[in-house]
Curated annotation (Swiss-Prot):
This protein's name: Ribosomal RNA large subunit methyltransferase M
Primary gene name: rlmM
Example GO BP: rRNA processing
Catalytic activity: cytidine(2498) in 23S rRNA + S-adenosyl-L-methionine = 2'-O-methylcytidine(2498) in 23S rRNA + S-adenosyl-L-homocysteine + H(+)
Organism: Shewanella sediminis (strain HAW-EB3)
InterPro entries given in the database record: RlmM_FDX (IPR040739), RlmM_THUMP-like (IPR048646), RNA_MeTrfase_FtsJ_dom (IPR002877), rRNA_MeTrfase_M (IPR011224), SAM-dependent_MTases_sf (IPR029063)
Family to which this protein belongs: Belongs to the class I-like SAM-binding methyltransferase superfamily. RNA methyltransferase RlmE family. RlmM subfamily.
């Protein structure tokens, strides 16, 4: 395997490319990126054969900001014959044995979506052939590598594999969430996805439990508050604007008509702080830092808008600065994670946990 294939949001190829170049260099693995704007994927071609599999194993997917999914891939397969696309694909996968799952995918672009029906239909005969040849186990296994076949154009595909313990559980790394009919805005999906992505399933009952107190800075009309309320939390919603009437009728929301940058919580028993304000990312980060230094929350989820040209570098700088500020203020035990989630647009979601091993 000579290529590392990374799925990303269309328009963010440059950021994804910059990040993987940086991370590969940290491992002393040489290579170069190949990408085109709005392709929704990046190829990092290694100088040494086999290095792509090393990257796919050693670089944790959750540590990458802009990549939704990645897999080690062979050289691009071109001009696959319409009457037999399977044979060249199986030849390319000859050294992949006993994989646990097959995913036939496309990049997340409007043009590529036209191939989704083909991919779905093509999966059935390809899966059977791979099972018969021993490339794929007879029964799916979540502990074995995942075979990926990604059609980037008609008759053109990258094939390879990802490690099941370092891979998104979703095809192309995209969770399919439903918009609740009573949610005040589509922004609600961002926090829903953030909770799914950052909070392990086995810890949700403890860390997203009914009766917790939360604060939503810049809450109106209540998209993020909605996700807290539906999990049974009591929310202080901070915004000068109007809140959704349905949320207010739950009795779980107290609306403070105030500036989120000036608000100080009257009670200090807050577990969750969430914030999705259209503001300079550095200013939002400084606000979260202030709340952390004051000890006003235990876990926080917030978005940083990305109007900058050098988005990867700027986000990295903001996160590094936050870590430095927390340490300088005697906050030693914390965890910062960041991801460009599917429901994010020109923004990233940051998760900050104080004393991450102490959940109460």
């Amino acid at each position: 395997m000579i290529n590392l294939f990374l799925f990303c949001r269309a328009g963010y190829e440059k950021e994804c490319a910059a990040e993987i170049q940086h991370r590969a260099a940290e491992l002393d693995i040489g290579g170069f990126v190949k990408t085109n704007k709005n392709d929704a994927y990046v190829i990092f071609q290694c100088f040494q054969a086999g290095d792509a599999a090393v990257l796919a194993q050693k670089i944790k997917l959750d540590s990458l900001i802009f990549a939704r999914q990645m897999f080690a891939a062979k050289a691009l397969l071109k001009n696959l014959p319409e009457n037999d696309r399977i044979t060249p694909i199986m030849e390319a996968l000859s050294d992949v044995r006993n994989a646990g799952e097959l995913r036939v995918e496309t990049p997340d672009t409007d043009a590529a979506k036209e191939r989704t029906t083909f991919c779905r239909k093509f999966t059935v005969p390809l899966r059977q052939k791979l099972k018969n040849s021993g490339n794929l186990l007879k029964k799916e296994s979540s502990s074995r590598p995942i075979i990926h076949v990604c059609f980037v154009a008609s008759g053109t595909a990258y094939v390879g594999f990802s490690f099941s313990n370092n891979s998104s559980p979703y095809p192309m790394g995209i969770p399919r969430l439903k918009m609740a009919s009573d949610a005040p805005s589509r922004s609600t999906l961002k926090l829903d996805e953030a909770f799914i992505h950052f909070i392990p399933e086995e810890e949700k009952e403890l860390r997203l439990s009914s009766g917790m107190n939360a604060v939503d800075l810049g809450a109106c009309p209540g998209g993020w508050t909605y996700q807290l309320v539906r999990r049974g939390m009591f929310v202080a919603a901070i915004d000068n604007g109007a809140m959704d009437e349905g949320l207010m009728e739950t009795g779980q929301v107290k609306h403070y008509q105030a500036d989120g940058f000036r608000f100080e919580p009257p009670r200090k028993n807050i577990y969750w702080l969430v914030c999705d304000m259209i503001e300079k990312p550095s200013r939002v980060a400084e606000l979260i830092e202030a709340w952390a230094i004051n000890g006003w929350f235990k876990e926080a989820m917030f978005n940083l808008k990305l109007p900058m040209k050098s988005r990867y570098q700027d986000v990295t700088t903001i996160l590094e600065t936050m870590a430095t500020v927390l340490k300088e203020n005697e906050i030693k035990n914390f965890s910062i994670k960041c991801k460009h989630l599917y429901h994010d647009r020109d923004e990233v979601t940051v998760y900050l946990s104080l004393n991450p091993t102490q959940v109460s």
